[in-house]
């Protein structure tokens, strides 16, 4: 079984890799590409960066002496991640940080030059990765089939293009989709235990009494990073904040109702929904209702048994009856009308 998994991963990565290793391009002026120009200037760092051009993205580094095999693998994974997002969401980010017409992913040196381990604009192109030189290169040397999933997370911020249709879940969307991309690429996840933990949180939540809105949104008393679940002694469980809870729910829905076919139908439906700005519990509930409607439409069945019975979303009897009577296989849904 392990041999089969290895060969499957190797086959996925080999199929998407360029025929020849990438070659570094001539240095380019990145003063309009880096996110925090002042930080680079204060650190007296050169803004002449080296481009490595992939199919969909331009990857910028400070060093042209990197192992071409490593950079080729890294860029191939990013390219496949970009294609996965574009295919499953049916959308693309607005152009912002580009080089020669291609979105940029910049490997920035350590030293507080970007927002944390990585940074990505929401709904627009441009990603910076701060762990590339100190961590990612070393991890590739340990496992040449590995890829750090934070690269797909930051691309997810670029690919959040749904405005207030799903804005309660922007960060959770990126957490969920990074794992969708990892599966599509077939790269080894060196933090696989983290994924298993996140997937397990759905069952922990289902067996708890935590309320739906407080768990999945920030409009019922908890901020994004606050733990949503507690152990038997009332202590916060690790890694169960709001984005994780959304991701664990979506990973379950994806697994149970059709894989990436379900994901693609879900985002197609979401794009047809009206925008609902979540300013209070009532509007957050309406945005969650859109989540349920799109999930049911993608699954071709009423998913209130999951959302309401298992996850404790509050709907009255009339609403539950309405869901039971719908023909969820109908391709001509008027999502705007349903959510008014």
Predicted regions and their residues:
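Juxtacatalytic substrate-recognition/specificity segment
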Residues: 46-162
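Zinc-dependent metallopeptidase catalytic helix centered on the HExxH motif
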Residues: 133-207
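Bacterial N-terminal signal peptides
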Residues: 5-14
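Boundary at the C-terminal end of the N-terminal hydrophobic targeting segment
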Residues: 15-19
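Long, well-structured alpha-helical subdomains associated
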Residues: 186-299, 304
């Amino acid at each position: 079984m392990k041999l089969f998994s290895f060969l499957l991963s190797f086959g996925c990565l080999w199929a998407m890799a360029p025929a020849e290793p990438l070659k570094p391009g001539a240095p380019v002026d990145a003063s309009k590409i880096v996110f925090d120009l002042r930080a680079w200037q204060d650190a007296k760092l050169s803004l002449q960066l080296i481009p490595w051009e992939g199919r969909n993205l331009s990857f910028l580094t400070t060093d042209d002496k990197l192992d071409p095999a490593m950079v080729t693998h890294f860029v191939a994974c990013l390219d496949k991640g970009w294609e996965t997002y574009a295919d499953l969401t049916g959308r693309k980010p607005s152009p912002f940080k580009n080089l020669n017409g291609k979105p940029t992913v910049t490997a920035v040196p350590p030293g507080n030059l970007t927002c944390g381990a990585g940074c990505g604009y929401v709904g627009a192109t441009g990603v910076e990765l701060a762990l590339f030189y100190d961590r990612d290169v070393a991890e590739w040397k340990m496992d040449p089939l590995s890829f750090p999933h934070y690269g797909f997370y930051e691309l997810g911020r670029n690919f959040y293009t749904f405005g207030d249709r799903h804005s309660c879940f922007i960060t959770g969307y990126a957490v969920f989709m990074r794992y969708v991309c990892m599966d599509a690429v077939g790269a080894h996840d060196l933090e696989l235990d983290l994924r298993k933990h996140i997937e397990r949180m759905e069952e922990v939540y289902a067996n708890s009494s935590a309320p739906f809105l407080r768990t999945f949104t920030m409009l019922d008393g908890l901020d994004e990073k606050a733990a949503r679940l507690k152990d038997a002694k009332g202590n916060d469980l690790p890694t169960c904040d709001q984005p994780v809870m959304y991701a664990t729910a979506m990973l379950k829905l994806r697994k149970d109702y059709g894989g990436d076919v379900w994901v693609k139908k879900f985002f197609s439906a979401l794009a047809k929904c009206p925008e609902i700005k979540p300013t209070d519990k009532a509007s957050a509930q309406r945005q969650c209702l859109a989540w349920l409607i799109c999930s049911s439409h993608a699954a071709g069945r009423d998913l209130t048994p999951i959302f309401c019975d298992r996850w404790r979303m509050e709907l009255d009897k009339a609403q539950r009856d309405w869901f039971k009577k719908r023909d969820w296989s109908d391709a001509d849904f008027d999502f705007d009308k349903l959510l008014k």
